[in-house]
Design a protein with these regions (language model features):
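Active-site bordering "gate/hinge" segments
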Residues: 1-391, 401, 411-412
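Extended hydrophobic-aromatic, low-complexity segments
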Residues: 392-396, 404-408
Length: 412
């Protein structure tokens, strides 16, 4: 007799979701649905509000990556008001965003992913959690994970007032600067973060890559999906988290598209299905081809593995060295092994730490010129960043008083 299996809620993920499996008369899977069953409504209830309120509202979309929404909103205001942040303000923003990348990637790896890789997929489900991870790696490492996240959240809090859910985003700049006294503890935090990033990658090699079972799992054909990939890159096609062009490569790794974030709606299509509240994004020129991978797909993937697949190189030397090792292990580029996303995540955290070491030494960081007030409303603004789990777009339109008349969000 046909029946249905429901897994609700799904745990250890960012947000809420459930899985429904429909079985045929023989008990085999006939269909499967991954559902986001909650209506968020941010695109609607923000209408009628002043645009400058968005950096205070949208961090509440997510408790894991509020800084990504905050920064996308702030950059959308830059575009809306036709203003570029000052060089010092941009440095401070990148410092904060790298700090967020570091603490966010480690909450994902150690709290959400490591229970499967470190504790093990065959362990008792009651042990597959952060306490089980600490039981395996030791209290000292557990305390380091907490410390690296706390210290980087202190940077976020110092610049934008709160962590999580920062709220100080301003068009053309930042709400406060960095003093020379601040620079000292920021340098210490950056150095500690770099040391921890190298340790985390070595831990992954020691625990995961030295275990044939895990390596076979990562390389297993069942966990490969051939799709297009999307991410931000700089002018040299290196991975950029804060800014740059949106680049798309095809399943073979060749460049398919490259465009300004402001033109995203010419290249990205949004599809809806009756069984989920989430929008299903695809490459507009290819049309909606359904949830299929391989030949004929119009789907693109984002997040850390996509970031490394899209970029010709990382921006920092240690991260680039680790990316080469990863692709050599996976059999070349692009890599379609979904489980390798966790490895790529640690490499992205390493780049963020390397960049903050450099930013902390930059003489311009302590400049008092932190706001460009040459604002000119142009009624439309789009902001884009690489959220930890992928390319994020915020699109705002206003009337001549700066009151929102349209909000569209493409959330990774």
């Amino acid at each position: 007799m046909a029946r249905k299996i429901t897994i609700d809620p799904i745990t250890r993920l960012e947000g809420h979701g459930k899985i429904e499996l429909l079985l045929d008369e023989e008990g085999k899977v006939k269909d499967a649905y991954w559902q986001v069953a909650e209506l968020r409504g941010f695109e609607r209830f923000c209408l009628g509000r002043p645009a400058e309120e968005m950096p205070r509202i949208v961090p509440n979309i997510c408790g894991v990556c509020p800084s990504a929404h905050h920064m996308a909103a702030t950059k959308a205001l830059d575009d809306l008001y036709s203003v570029e942040p000052t060089p010092a303000a941009r440095l401070i923003r990148e410092l904060e965003y790298n700090a967020f990348y570091i603490e966010d990637h480690y909450i994902h790896f150690f709290f959400l992913a490591a229970p499967d890789f470190v504790v093990g997929p065959h362990a008792d489900p009651k042990e597959r959690n952060i306490l089980g991870v600490i039981g395996k790696v030791g209290t000292e490492i557990g305390l380091k994970v907490i410390e690296v996240r706390k210290r980087n959240r202190d940077i976020i809090r110092h610049i934008f007032g709160k962590a999580p859910h920062p709220e100080g985003g301003l068009p053309g700049g930042v709400p406060r600067g960095i003093s020379e006294q601040d620079r000292k503890w920021i340098k210490d935090t950056a150095a500690f973060s770099l040391e921890f990033a190298q340790f985390a990658i070595q831990l992954f090699k020691d625990v995961v890559l030295s275990n044939k079972y895990y390596v076979d799992l990562i390389l297993n054909e069942a966990y490969k999906l051939k799709t297009y990939y999307m991410a931000l890159v700089d002018e040299d096609n290196r991975a950029n988290f804060y800014d740059g062009k949106v680049r798309v490569v095809d399943p073979e790794g060749a460049e398919y598209l490259k465009f300004d974030a402001r033109d995203y709606d010419q290249y990205i299509g949004e599809w809806v299905e009756p069984w989920t509240y989430i929008k299903l994004n695809h490459l507009r020129k290819l049309g909606w081809q359904g949830l299929k991978e391989g030949d004929g797909t119009s789907l693109y993937r984002v997040a850390p593995l996509a970031r490394l697949n899209v970029a010709d190189a990382m921006q920092s030397p240690l991260a680039q060295k680790e990316a080469v090792i990863m692709f050599d292990t996976l059999g070349g580029k692009p890599a379609h092994q979904t489980l390798a996303t966790h490895w790529a995540r640690l490499i992205c955290a390493l780049q963020a730490a390397e960049q903050n070491v450099n930013i902390a030494d930059d003489p311009q960081l302590t400049s008092k010129d932190i706001r460009n007030m040459n604002l000119k409303l142009k009624n439309k603004g789009v902001g884009c960043v690489e959220a930890p789990r992928g390319t994020l777009f915020h699109h705002y339109e206003t009337d001549d008083e700066g009151i929102l008349t349209k909000v569209n969000l493409i959330v990774a």
